A protein has these predicted regions:
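Active-site entrance/lid segments in N-terminal catalytic domains of soluble metabolic enzymes
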Residues: 1-183
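Residues that cap or flank secondary-structure elements
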Residues: 75, 192-193
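Conserved active-site-proximal phosphate/metal-binding subdomains
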Residues: 154-169, 173, 177-190, 196-274
């Protein structure tokens, strides 16, 4: 959803200005049903962002993008199809499917020449979610190249309800590993969410994980694109500064810092209600 803005800031395009001009009359209207992405612009912006990144890549490492299925804007299926295929066309090494079951996402890419060459994986938070996904992908004779198993302590959107504290990453990983073994499927598993130390990582690797995913710990790294002020918020945050809420328009619970601007906006909206 932010790719047009990213393109404007990085490549001096004017996609956001163009869209704002078209829907200027609707800016103050809470009903956004008429607002649509220009899918041609979404494709162009994605190809610019991904293509320039791939051109700048050095070494043998791979570059992946995370693509959320859950969109609150109109025409979500068509938008998702454009985003996925534009990334493949621009040469991305791999795509991680997130924020949704993605039951139709492989089909949206099936006609792309790189569908079987690029690394395609999915984030799940339960064995049930993976089972549903695999039922769809096996019809295309294309298994995922990896599965990220995200636990209840992850930052950002969670694949759980507000009862997230009742779940445990290690248990979910074990359940999925057992299921894949039973089905004789060899798919690399990558635990994520709540892996805070090297010891945490080693424990999962010793149990057979192909890798681990760590994100929040790297928000304060030099390579992270966040402003220094935001990095400092992460660095100094304590447990009481972290909250799980339902302010996201996706409908998923979300873990965030209490200082995030999204919460200030949410509080302001509530205070303005009659």
């Amino acid at each position: 959803a932010m790719i047009l803005d990213v393109s404007d800031r990085r490549f001096d395009t004017e996609f956001v200005k163009e869209k704002t001009k078209i829907y200027k009359h609707n800016i103050l209207n809470s009903d956004k049903s008429e607002v649509l992405f220009n899918l041609g612009r979404v494709a162009e912006a994605t190809k610019l962002h991904v293509g320039k990144t791939m051109e700048a890549k050095q070494g043998d490492g791979m570059v992946f993008v995370n693509c959320m299925e859950k969109l609150s804007m109109n025409a979500p299926r068509d938008t998702l199809q454009v985003r996925l295929n534009a990334a493949l066309d621009a040469g991305i090494d791999g795509i991680t499917l997130s924020a949704g079951l993605h039951l139709g996402s492989f089909a949206l890419m099936a006609d792309n020449p790189r569908f079987r060459d690029a690394k395609l994986g999915i984030i799940v938070s339960s064995v049930r979610a993976l089972q549903l996904f695999l039922r769809k992908t096996t019809k295309l004779n294309r298994l995922p190249d990896f599965v990220v198993i995200e636990g209840p302590l992850a930052g950002g959107h969670l694949g759980f309800g507000m009862d997230w504290a009742q779940y445990d990453l290690a248990t979910i990983v074990a359940e999925i590993a057992a299921y894949l073994k039973k089905e004789q499927l060899d798919i690399p598993l990558i635990p994520a969410g709540g892996i805070f130390t090297g010891t945490d990582a080693v424990e999962f690797l010793e149990k057979g994980a192909a890798a681990v995913q760590v994100a929040t710990r790297f928000t304060v790294a030099k390579e992270c694109g966040l402003p220094d002020k935001v990095k400092q918020e992460y660095f100094t945050a304590r447990e009481e500064n972290i909250v799980v809420n339902t302010v996201s328009p996706t409908g998923y619970p979300m873990r965030m810092l209490t200082s995030t601007p999204a919460l200030a906006i949410s509080r302001k909206k509530r205070s303005c209600r009659p």
